[in-house]
Amino acid sequence: MGLKMSESAKPYFAMVCLQFGYAGMNLVTKVVLDRGMSHYVLVAYRNAFATAAIAPFALLSERKVRPKMTFPIFMQIFVLALLGPLIDQNLYYAGLKLTSPTFAGAVTNIVPALTFIISIICRMEKVEMRKVRFQAKVVGTLVIVVGAMLMILFKIPLITFLRSHLTGHALSPAGEDYLKATVFLLIASFSWASFFVLQAATLKRYSSHLSLSTMVCFMGTLQSTALTFVMEPNLSAWNIGFDMNLLASAYAGIMSSSIAYYVQGMMTKQKSVIFVTAFNPLVVIIGSIIGFLILNQTLNLGGVLGMAILVVGVCTVLWGKEGDIDEEENIEEKFVEIVKCCNRCDIKVLSMMPRIDEEVDVEMQSAGTAKVAVGFS
């Protein structure tokens, strides 16, 4: 029983660890972006590091089981690279540069909701409004969106709010225009959600997720490099040394691209795309706590309320999705039992039936008896 529980906890542990990696990536890349590094160059280097890190494992471990590459699968990989490395990463970094890791993470908390909607449109998620589990997924998704909106709209320092509430002084919140960054982050979120859904569909036709992750990173490297040459014609923008720029590129590529794509693909095959995206809100929670404890960042009232609501939403979605997974596993177990039962019945029937050589012997004996009877007559 203990072994079974530990096996069932591995997907949750893997996804939580992955969110810590994303939170660290946000903090590190924010530093290099503020220092002037081009986000186009950062994306190109990130995917180059990701390809170099994951390609050897794909070549060695999946060389005998890799499915045949077809043109439709190649086009899906091309679109995956377009949605993930090119559009999502560039627009996310553009929004991150204009705002903060907390704000960027709060806006992208709508990814679970977008993924849920796209999955329903693509008929990857069943609409069963009468079932409590489906209702839980809907309610949990809405709760996540509400928590994200709180973290975005209420940028009021908690200490200032408490002080003003006690003293009766009016608040004067700073008017900061985040419209441009919000547009970038919303488009990036839609692209990221579409990436998850297309990745799940591609894995059904191309099951080697390690090789798939490698090809997505490699295709993303080619696409982002071409875009960088167009957007950054000055070749000096590519200059990189043994500094923070190199660390950010390597960390983002290895942790947030190669490992992330692999783990997300594996969890998508084992669980579902809704399960994978449900953990995304943890990034902003982890980032806010790290920023408050280590970087002395201000803890916002909206952040505190939003984080509490996000946790409730994530748990609700996971509870609803886990019920679907249990039902699917029960159906599979029943199907296997039926197949085994049918096989046993077939074996029993076949064992009762005479073999071909026995049938031939019976026919020969019958023919011989008939000839003897004719002779006597």
Curated annotation (Swiss-Prot):
Keyword Thylakoid included in the entry's annotation: no
Compartments it resides in: Membrane
Main location: membrane
Source organism, top-level taxon: Eukaryota
Gene Ontology molecular functions: transmembrane transporter activity
TM segment ranges: 13-33, 40-60, 67-87, 102-122, 142-162, 183-203, 210-230, 235-255, 274-294, 299-319
One term under GO cellular component: membrane
Pfam families the record matches: EamA (PF00892)
Keywords in alphabetical order: Membrane, Repeat, Transmembrane, Transmembrane helix
Domain EamA: 22-152, 190-318
Membrane topology label: Multi-pass membrane protein
Keyword Transmembrane: yes
Record-stated family: Belongs to the drug/metabolite transporter (DMT) superfamily. Plant drug/metabolite exporter (P-DME) (TC 2.A.7.4) family.
Protein's recorded name: WAT1-related protein At3g56620
Provenance organism: Arabidopsis thaliana (Mouse-ear cress)
